[in-house]
Regions:
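Short beta-strand/loop element within the Bergerat-fold HATPase_c
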Residues: 143-155
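Conserved small/polar residues in nucleotide/adenosyl-binding loops
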Residues: 239-246
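Short alpha-helical segment of the dimerization/phosphotransfer core of two-component systems
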Residues: 55-63
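Short helix-loop "hinge" at the ATP-lid/N-box region of the Bergerat-fold HATPase_c
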Residues: 136-137
Length: 251
């Protein structure tokens, strides 16, 4: 039974990867044509044409992000996960990278991180934290705050991201990590989301043999907590594989 289930998941991942690869080329060609058109002047265009071109450009960019995330999800298993990660330093970097986005909504980013190390993939854990904090900013109230906390208890690393937004309805908490699921579809479209950010987070947690949950927050907002074992494999030297500009392409 387990072998059949594993094979089914393997086929599903392969299909997703193949579909994403097939979509990438036509989307790139459309983006090139749209970029060429947008780089020129078209004084004869009426308001409807301008709006249509704008919509096509935005939707093509959205689909391109979706394809990139699907490819990332299909390739997670191939990424090495034996680096020693300085978690508090990584979180500081994420907060610095997302500070401009937070400033747009006057949101305060707060790091409460003790000296914590764990074994895993530096580039994947960065993306996990980035996606969680980015979500917490996007779905927060203007003038709110985002608190990122990391600490070690016994042989477990705990990482949590808390926001002061509207929170997630109890009946939807089990579904927020599903691909393409959105709590508020209209708001997600407005913010440019494709419904894969938390699904990618969930997959990163899975390949690190961790767990993720939404914790109760009496003061409102959302708390997402991730838990990892400190030493899931034998550690090797700490390396920083991610180029700084990688963060600009995240979903």
């Amino acid at each position: 039974m387990l072998e059949r289930l594993s094979e089914a998941f393997k086929i599903q991942r392969q299909f997703t990867e193949n579909a994403a690869h097939e979509l990438r080329t036509p989307l790139s060609l459309m983006q090139i044509q749209l970029d060429l058109y947008n780089s020129g002047k078209h004084p004869g265009n009426d308001a409807d044409t301008i709006q249509t071109i704008k919509m096509l450009t935005e939707q093509n960019e959205r689909l391109s992000k979706m394809v990139k995330t699907l490819l990332d999800m299909s390739e997670l298993q191939t990424v090495g996960r034996d680096e020693m990660i300085i978690v508090n330093a990584l979180i500081d970097e994420v907060l610095a990278d997302l500070e401009p986005l937070a400033q747009e909504k006057n949101i305060k980013l707060i790091g409460k991180c003790k000296d914590v190390n764990m074994v895993g993939s530096d580039i994947l854990i960065y993306r996990l934290v980035y996606n969680l904090v980015e979500n917490a900013i996007k779905y927060n109230h203007y003038g709110g705050q985002v608190i990122v906390e990391a600490y070690q208890k016994e042989k477990q690393v705990y990482l949590s991201v808390e926001d002061t937004g509207s929170g997630i309805p109890e009946e939807l908490k089990e579904r927020v990590f599903e691909p393409f699921f959105r709590v508020d579809k209209s708001r997600s479209r407005e913010l440019g989301g494709v419904g894969l950010g938390l699904a990618l987070v969930n997959e990163i947690v899975r390949v690190h043999d961790g767990s993720i949950a939404i914790r109760p927050n009496p003061s409102g907002g959302t708390i997402i907590e991730v838990q990892f074992a400190v030493n899931r494999t034998t550690a090797v030297s700490y390396t920083h594989l991610r180029a700084h500009e990688t963060s600009q392409d995240l979903v």
